[in-house]
Amino acid sequence: MSDVSNEAARRRTFAIISHPDAGKTTLTEKLLLFGGAIQMAGSVKGRKAARHATSDWMALEKERGISVTSSVMQFPYEGKIVNLLDTPGHADFGEDTYRVLTAVDSALMVIDVAKGVEERTIKLMEVCRLRDTPIMTFINKLDREGKNPIDLLDEVETVLGIQCAPVTWPIGMGQRLKGVVHLISGEVHLYEQGRNFTRQDSTIFPSLDAPGLAEKIGEQMLTELRDELELVQGASNPFDLDAYRAGQQTPVFFGSGVNNFGVQPLLDFFIEHAPPPQTRETTGRRVAPSETKLSGFVFKIQANMDPQHRDRVAFMRVCSGKFTAGMKTLHVRSGKDVKLANALTFMASDREIAAEAWPGDVIGIHNHGTISIGDTFTEGESLSFTGIPNFAPELFRRARLRDPLKLKQLQKGLAQLSEEGATQFFRPLMSNDLILGAVGVLQFDVVAYRLKDEYGVDAIFEPVSVTTARWVHCDNVKKLDEFREKNAGNLGIDAAGQLVYLAPTRVNLQLAQERAPDVRFSATREHVHAKAID
């Protein structure tokens, strides 16, 4: 095996997905703790404490206690290199989450034991389904009272349409929580106060028949557990690696992230069974991770990771070959050669200069406005990775300045924030308005906060008569020009220079579509080959 194949085989690149407040950020902290990446996991609840959760690094996130931008964290574990991409838990940031899911090889779904499958989980699951992403499930907050575990498995299977294969099973919950039993190894991991539940600091019995176990959990509970396990193993599916890798089955674990309990069995199983980097589709051909030439795509752009410097970093997922510091690459969209000199690796907001990176790794490239989401970098081959979408926003606001002299800063700020995908930004053809589009109201708060904090611009967002937007395409240039003339009042340009129809009502959109049968109206736009505008 070549170096590239060896290194690719060691990588495990995944994202954690969940409904807000299911405990995703806490679990992220605990995984990093096991990887030795952080010494002291920051509790998510004590917001006023100086120590904030490692993965929530933007000032606004620290204030509100929600993950708004996705971070990238890398840590070694058991001879493997784990790349963990944290995703925004808040409902308004679905688009950013979707794009992160294009950059991973598998996902970990976190479910609150008391709430079960929630709306956001369903949406994220649909996204994973589009790509057949393999998913493991961690049912969290076992130290609190919650739903019956058998009912939870049934809920996941029915609502999310994926087969469940329980790998660990709870022994009681809430006040009665005694531990979990590992259904594959047979081990029993006890839950005891004051332990940190690493293998070195846990009481583990080799099986349910081990002497001394009955004393620890009580004869009655042991009998109930045996009956329950008989029922569970009869009614559920055994773990099937092929079904999991095809996205048809999810191995299920139970635990309590905040207490570190049940996390290590999950991490050990993940390391053993989650897929390494996979072959990926491009416009020309499929690219295998073992190829010796570098290729990668940008799935996210983050402005101002370092408040001391107005910087922008493009996050690139390496898909094949080896990245070395200072190497020359082809920026496919512009056709220019770009030297990747000071690329970064990440531990949330702690960054280090990357000396090398392999398939599955994520590196940060300093971006001075020339790189867009969806851009591909190669060692010379002209190909582009596909499937990184922009969604039509559902909410729109007009930006108005309190200080009209700050127009230039406002335009720059909006262009940069839309480039990183925090919002979408449209300029109507027939007016000087600056219109923002978002998936949820919180996004406008975030943009207003960041404009003020990072660009010194105080902007107000007012309602505007736009209900929805569609990207407009037509192969016939003459027909497109005609359409443009007739509908100029409803047309605008997005931040990538694409023509967009800004519909005041759904009825108006329907009429426009009926009157222009040759014009295609799209609710999503691929980031591939997006053209940047000043």
UniProtKB/Swiss-Prot annotation:
Protein name: Peptide chain release factor 3
GO CC terms: cytosol
Residues at which GTP binds: 18-25, 86-90, 140-143
Cell compartments where the protein resides: Cytoplasm
Family indicated by similarity: Belongs to the TRAFAC class translation factor GTPase superfamily. Classic translation factor GTPase family. PrfC subfamily.
Keywords: Cytoplasm, GTP-binding, Nucleotide-binding, Protein biosynthesis
Pfam families: EF-G_D2, GTP_EFTU, RF3_C
GO function terms (MF aspect): GTP binding; GTPase activity; guanosine tetraphosphate binding; translation release factor activity, codon nonspecific; translation release factor activity, codon specific
HAMAP family: Rel_fac_3 (MF_00072)
Superkingdom of origin: Bacteria
Chief location of this protein within or outside the cell: cytoplasm
Boundaries of every tr-type G domain copy: 9-278
InterPro entries reported for this sequence: EF-G-like_DII (IPR053905), EFG_III/V (IPR035647), G_TR_CS (IPR031157), P-loop_NTPase (IPR027417), PrfC (IPR004548), RF3_C (IPR032090), RF3_dom_3_sf (IPR038467), RF3_GTP-bd (IPR041732)
Function per UniProt: Increases the formation of ribosomal termination complexes and stimulates activities of RF-1 and RF-2. It binds guanine nucleotides and has strong preference for UGA stop codons. It may interact directly with the ribosome. The stimulation of RF-1 and RF-2 is significantly reduced by GTP and GDP, but not by GMP.
GO biological process, one term: regulation of translational termination
